[in-house]
């Protein structure tokens, strides 16, 4: 750890404290994540180290670069490139955020590019939310943070400071207890983030797992076998769920054009096997005026 000097604590993430730090060798500013593991006394599981080492290979302009992994005194430190703004802070501090439809489109495109890259490397995120989408103010580029960490460390119910980990962006198949979920879980999260950028408020702000499910059902309709094959066999599905009819998504994103509504509805299909994938989403008509961003 001698190579890095902590400058200040900048936050408390899902897995531990995040510091702004300086690389003493290159003088570069970096973000240092100290991973707090459940079994402190046992040190770092070798599976976690293997998973994390694979992430160092991931290189893409829309992914926050994992520069180094330091295993020191039973602690794991992850060294990332430093970005000081996330999408949540940006939305909260920009009253007219939802009016800049072109910027929202470029952000969504970049999110999908990062996800398509990760999915092509068989890496899921599982915990996408505005807080882990980082923005480089100089270039207005957006980068996904914390990709692959859920597989290495699991997703806790609460952070180490006892904050509840948000459920607002969690896909229905996870909430219903599926153990065989895959890349569509990230697309669901992106749909929720897209809707939030457009309306500047969360689409499904649940405060418990059942409340989260019911908030989804009230808008998207309660799923049943005809609309989602196999749903009634999922561990947490109950035949006693209230039967809500689907509503019109447009009413929640009134300033989104028809192409945008079409893309959003394809991302928020309840049945994960029917949900659009990241590559297909990038080819959607909604992005045609971007002229294939670099």
From Swiss-Prot:
Its EC number is 2.7.11.22, 2.7.11.23. Residues 4-287 form the Protein kinase domain. One of its GO terms (molecular function) is protein kinase activity. The modification Phosphotyrosine is found at residue 15. It comes from Arabidopsis thaliana (Mouse-ear cress). CDK kinase activated by CDKF-1. CDK kinase activity inhibited by KRP1/ICK1, KRP2/ICK2, KRP3/ICK6, KRP4/ICK7, KRP5/ICK3, KRP6/ICK4 and KRP7/ICK5. Down-regulated by phosphorylation by WEE1. InterPro entries: CDK, Kinase-like_dom_sf, Prot_kinase_dom, Protein_kinase_ATP_BS, Ser/Thr_kinase_AS. This is Cyclin-dependent kinase A-1. It catalyses: L-seryl-[protein] + ATP = O-phospho-L-seryl-[protein] + ADP + H(+); L-threonyl-[protein] + ATP = O-phospho-L-threonyl-[protein] + ADP + H(+); [DNA-directed RNA polymerase] + ATP = phospho-[DNA-directed RNA polymerase] + ADP + H(+). The keyword Transcription regulation does not apply. Induction: By nematode infection in roots. Down-regulated by salt stress in root meristem and replication blocking agents (hydroxyurea and aphidicolin). Belongs to the protein kinase superfamily. CMGC Ser/Thr protein kinase family. CDC2/CDKX subfamily.
